[in-house]
């Protein structure tokens, strides 16, 4: 173990001499307290160390010990339902050890419980040839997630001994004869967080991730293995969008990284998720969630590590063949941590003081998402969907973090403060936002629903865009200058906005909408527009149609509160629309109003 001496302390940056044998990315124990740090720069024998804990009270002359290991996470049974800090220390154990509600310094804790016994069920027999990524057995970690035990990277050989039984994560469960000799496998692996886990092949992401949020699933979908950004000013609803996706998306596992945001938001997750039921499995949402909490009052440097810790845990479960979603809230705070460390290292600043390598660091993170075939002989498919909030100051999306993010993600959900002020949530602006997965998702949904989903989505978006143009005319010369056809367009667009896009995250029914219900709701609104337009062409007046369809339009607006089990009620509105408008045409028609 290399032992150096501190020569300078500057906030989270510590410089130490006599470190010639240490390497970049080595973990260090800094000072007499032994706080955790990581070497980020070497100049001759002087190492610059970013410290993941508070450095007050540490001074020159104190020792620095290099461990010779990179910042790594422990991967094994016991990860799910846990809450970790940015360097994978379990917060509940931390509290028991320190007897404090705040993080103590210099406390070394294992990430996983090394004494708990897990029942291991072997799925292969002795004499089987195995290589990296092959599954040798499993542990039922929660009611939802079967934790598959894989052969670690770099090991290939014949199974000499394996048995089912109750083991800790440190007990040998399997012996493999390799070219280098006998290797004992345990249920735990370690993996450096800054290195992506290897895969066999990357696939095209073309299966939509159903989030239950109508504006996202219909107009701006994200696929399993895709990457999405949610930029928006303060109060626009970024965190609620992230929470909704974490709650209701049809993935197997969610990794939620609270990176530099308010502690109350993580508390909400901890309080809400155990009580909420996953519509896909019928079990508690906490049974499929991993939380990484790095709130705004925690050390800045640990924010930078928390994103990598989260994506490495996500990759581990992806390699088992699971679909994983990782939420980072927010990458702006992570970028601010990069900016602070860069400033203390006296590097040349880029735009707005961010380091010149901001774009490449963001790209490194997002490129670890994707739909893949994992290592192993059974062609397992898994995916990581990366969804990150971006908090541009003042809502200015031309700032560097947002711009560099938009270069690498394919979905942009732009939150609009003016919509939020009107209490239109989710406040995703349908004119600014986009998804480059729309074509693939449209094809997929047409096949699944056996219906013209993509045509309906195109028609709905055309109406919303037409409304934007008509609003310009209305602002200039007033609504009376519009033709009946144009006034009908405004009414249908209003119905799409208020009855379809607007969604109440705190209503038991409206919080989640299945794709079948979304299809039926959108079809009802477009059917009203189509039938009303037909009535106009037959001579009915706009005012006649609006007065005669008050009851049916009321039913359309209430359709979002119809439970999933009663979808036939929504379909029945289509017939009611046709009958009502036919009655208006037969009774009114060319009569003057």
Swiss-Prot record:
This protein's GO CC annotations: proton-transporting ATP synthase complex
Induction: By increasing intracellular Na(+) concentration.
Alphabetic keyword roster: ATP-binding, Ion transport, Nucleotide-binding, Sodium, Sodium transport, Translocase, Transport
The keyword ATP-binding is assigned to this record: yes
Class of the enzyme per the UniProt entry, highest EC level: translocase
Any one Gene Ontology molecular-function term assigned to this protein's record: proton-transporting ATP synthase activity, rotational mechanism
SUPFAM superfamilies given in the database record: C-terminal domain of alpha and beta subunits of F1 ATP synthase, N-terminal domain of alpha and beta subunits of F1 ATP synthase, P-loop containing nucleoside triphosphate hydrolases
Example GO BP: proton motive force-driven plasma membrane ATP synthesis
Intrachain S-S bonds: none
Listed CDD domains: ATP-synt_V_A-type_alpha_C (cd18111), ATP-synt_V_A-type_alpha_N (cd18119), V_A-ATPase_A (cd01134)
Coiled-coil region(s): none
Chemical reaction(s) catalysed: 4 Na(+)(in) + ATP + H2O = 4 Na(+)(out) + ADP + phosphate + H(+)
Annotated residues for binding of ATP: 232-239
NCBIfam families linked to this entry: PRK04192.1 (NF003220)
Name of the protein in its database record: V-type sodium ATPase catalytic subunit A
């Amino acid at each position: 173990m290399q032992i150096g001496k501190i020569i300078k302390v500057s906030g989270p940056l510590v410089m130490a001499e006599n470190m010639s044998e240490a390497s970049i990315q080595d973990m260090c124990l800094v000072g007499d307290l032994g706080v955790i740090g990581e070497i980020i720069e070497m100049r001759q024998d002087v190492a610059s160390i970013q410290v993941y804990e508070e450095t007050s009270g540490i001074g020159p002359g104190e020792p620095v010990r290099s461990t010779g290991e990179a910042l790594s996470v422990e991967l094994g049974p016991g990860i799910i339902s846990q809450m970790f800090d940015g360097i994978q220390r379990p917060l509940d154990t931390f509290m028991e050890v320190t007897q404090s509600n705040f993080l103590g310094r210099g406390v070394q804790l294992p990430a996983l419980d090394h004494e708990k016994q897990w029942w291991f069920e072997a799925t292969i027999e002795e004499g089987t040839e195995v290589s990296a990524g092959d599954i040798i057995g499993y542990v039922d970690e929660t009611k939802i997630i079967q934790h598959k035990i894989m052969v670690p990277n770099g090991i290939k050989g014949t199974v000499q001994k394996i048995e089912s039984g109750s083991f800790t994560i440190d007990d040998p469960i399997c012996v493999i004869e390799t070219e280098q000799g006998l290797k004992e496998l345990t249920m735990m692996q370690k993996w450096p967080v800054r290195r992506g886990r290897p895969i066999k092949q990357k696939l095209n992401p073309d299966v939509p991730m159903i989030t239950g949020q109508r504006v996202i699933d219909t107009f701006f979908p994200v696929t399993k293995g895709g990457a999405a950004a949610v930029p928006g000013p303060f109060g626009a609803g970024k965190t609620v969008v992230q929470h909704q996706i974490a709650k209701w998306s049809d993935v197997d596992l969610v990794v939620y990284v609270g990176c530099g945001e308010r502690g109350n938001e993580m508390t909400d997750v901890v309080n809400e998720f155990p009580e909420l039921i996953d519509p896909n499995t019928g079990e508690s949402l906490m049974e499929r969630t991993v939380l990484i909490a790095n709130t705004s009052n925690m050390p800045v440097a640990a924010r930078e590590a928390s994103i990598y810790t989260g994506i490495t845990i996500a990759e581990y479960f992806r390699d088992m063949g699971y679909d994983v979603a990782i939420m980072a809230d927010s990458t702006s705070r992570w970028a601010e941590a990069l900016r602070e460390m860069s400033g203390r290292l006296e590097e040349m600043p880029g735009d707005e003081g961010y380091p010149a390598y901001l774009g490449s660091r963001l790209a490194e993170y997002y490129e670890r998402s994707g739909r893949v075939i994992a290592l192993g002989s059974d062609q397992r498919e898994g995916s990581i969907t990366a969804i990150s909030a971006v908090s541009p100051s003042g809502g200015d999306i031309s700032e560097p973090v947002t711009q560099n993010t938009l270069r690498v993600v394919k979905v942009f959900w732009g939150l609009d403060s003016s919509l939020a002020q009107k209490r239109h949530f989710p406040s995703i602006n349908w004119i600014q936002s986009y998804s480059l997965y729309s074509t693939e998702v449209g094809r997929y949904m047409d096949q699944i629903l056996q219906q013209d989903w993509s045509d309906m989505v195109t028609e709905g978006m055309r109406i919303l865009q037409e409304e934007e143009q008509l609003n310009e005319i209305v602002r200039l010369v007033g609504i009376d200058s519009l033709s009946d056809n144009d006034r009908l367009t405004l009414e249908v667009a209003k119905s799409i906005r208020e009855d379809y896009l607007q969604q109440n995250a705190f209503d038991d029914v409206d919080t989640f909408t299945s794709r079948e219900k979304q299809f039926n709701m959108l079809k009802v609104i477009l059917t009203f527009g189509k039938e009303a337009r037909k009535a106009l062409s037959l001579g009915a007046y706009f005012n006649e149609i609006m007065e005669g369809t008050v009851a049916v339009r009321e039913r359309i607006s209430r359709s979002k509160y119809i439970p999933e089990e009663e979808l036939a009620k929504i379909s029945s509105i289509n017939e009611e629309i046709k009958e009502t408008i036919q009655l208006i045409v037969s009774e009114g028609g060319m009569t003057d109003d």
